[in-house]
Design a protein with these regions (language model features):
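Structural/interface elements that position substrates and couple domains in central-metabolism enzymes
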Residues: 1-272
Length: 272
């Protein structure tokens, strides 16, 4: 399948490299010409274990390319991923200017039906704002037919283990609302991720708003576990208890489990 990914950052490059590894034809587009030049010169603007080798292999086999040309990327991709940053504003809310700007740019070049996939971490309701940007651009060109479907497919990657997480996912969450294009989009996404569903169905289908909230809820749950264990570690120090013993005692409960129960420096990073 032909895939375009807008945003050659952490999520975009890992997604692009892994999809190319699965045999898809991938174009990654970024507005940063220096970053694209680095990628075309076999460099990487980020570090992730195994990504350099993955990219080199797929460059050599002609399955992944990099460009600054949005028109080329939109024309190429049957499925177009939006994987740009959504940094926090001063008030803590997500800054969606890059996501919405990308949607507007895609809309200017749409000529035939595309599946637009929100991969960025975005607030609930963002898909509808993306949809409006796309439709506004089509309206300006006098195009009334339905040339896109906006869906949500949040990422669940850990820095340092992103390739493993992508290639061996716990689950693949896809938010798709009922529409005239539902069957077409469902089939395309099933085909895209078919490699992961051969022995066990990993795709969880839901509506778009639920998929957007799932990503936020997962992040919040993990943050809660990490913060909770750091508080218990502080309490252990005060009371003379051994936090490692406490951790093992808590984790042995099947309702809790051992993952993300290690006290440490807290949480953060571009991929939580």
């Amino acid at each position: 399948m032909k895939i375009s990914i807008v945003g050659a950052g952490y999520v975009g490059l890992v997604t692009g490299g892994c999809l190319a590894e699965l045999g898809h034809q991938v174009i990654c587009i970024d507005s940063d010409a220096d970053k694209v030049a680095t990628l075309n010169a076999a460099g990487l603007p980020i570090y992730e274990p195994g990504l350099q080798e993955l990219m080199a292999r797929n460059r050599a086999e002609g399955r992944i390319h990099f460009t600054t040309d949005m028109a080329q990327a939109v024309e190429h991709g049957e499925v177009i991923f939006i994987a740009v940053g959504t940094p926090s504003k001063e008030d803590g809310s997500a800054d969606l200017q890059h996501v919405l700007a990308v949607a507007t740019q895609i809309g200017r070049h749409l000529k035939k039906f595309k599946v637009i996939v929100n991969k960025s971490t975005v607030p609930v309701g963002t898909a509808y704002r993306v949809q409006k940007c796309l439709q506004d651009e089509l309206n300006k060109r006098g195009i009334q037919e339905s040339l896109f479907e906006v869906i949500s497919n949040p990422e669940f990657l850990k820095e340092g283990a992103a390739i493993k997480d992508f290639m061996h996912p716990d689950r693949i969450v896809i938010g798709l609302d009922e529409s005239a294009n539902y069957k077409t989009v469902h089939q395309k996404m099933e085909l895209l991720y078919s490699s992961f569903n051969r022995h066990h169905a990993r795709t969880i289908w839901m509506d778009v708003r639920s998929a957007e909230l799932t990503k936020y809820a997962a992040n919040a749950m993990l943050a809660t576990r990490i913060s909770f264990m750091n508080e218990i570690a502080n309490l252990s120090d005060l009371l003379g208890a051994d936090i490692d013993c406490v951790r093992r005692g808590i984790g042995a409960d099947q309702r809790i489990g051992h993952d993300f129960l290690y006290a440490g420096t807290g949480y953060g990073g571009s991929c939580f």
